[in-house]
């Protein structure tokens, strides 16, 4: 399956910790589970028109949930923490959230 830039970046992660990291030009996104670091870097540079210095990824396993006798599982996920270069501008998507 060929992933486009908009397929790779699912949604931003808005938490207290991720908001504090924005001061250091670190932005957190939920990304496609099959995307690798170079694909995430290319996608962020294309979509937001910024320069990426570093990408760290975290794989998360979905929790097992029960509803009575029925057992289900939430989807696995991947988060990417993207660090921008010093001369790069901030991502406008997050500007209104601070």
Curated annotation (Swiss-Prot):
Disulfide bonds: none annotated. Keywords: Ribonucleoprotein, Ribosomal protein, RNA-binding, rRNA-binding. It comes from Clostridium botulinum (strain Eklund 17B / Type B). One of its GO terms (molecular function) is structural constituent of ribosome. Pfam families: Ribosomal_L23. Gene3D superfamilies: 3.30.70.330. This is Large ribosomal subunit protein uL23. HAMAP family: Ribosomal_uL23_B. It comes from the Bacteria. Part of the 50S ribosomal subunit. Contacts protein L29, and trigger factor when it is bound to the ribosome. GO terms for biological process: translation. Transmembrane segments: none annotated. One of its GO terms (cellular component) is ribosome. One of the early assembly proteins it binds 23S rRNA. One of the proteins that surrounds the polypeptide exit tunnel on the outside of the ribosome. Forms the main docking site for trigger factor binding to the ribosome. Belongs to the universal ribosomal protein uL23 family.
């Amino acid at each position: 399956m060929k992933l486009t830039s908009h397929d790779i970046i699912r949604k931003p992660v808005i938490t207290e910790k991720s908001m504090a990291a924005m001061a250091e030009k670190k932005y957190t996104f939920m990304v496609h589970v099959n995307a690798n670091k170079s694909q995430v870097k290319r996608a962020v540079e294309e979509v937001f028109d910024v320069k990426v210095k570093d990408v760290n990824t975290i794989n998360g396993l979905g929790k097992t949930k029960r509803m009575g006798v029925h057992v289900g599982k939430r989807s696995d996920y991947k988060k990417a923490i993207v660090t921008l270069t010093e001369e790069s501008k901030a991502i406008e998507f997050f500007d209104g959230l601070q």
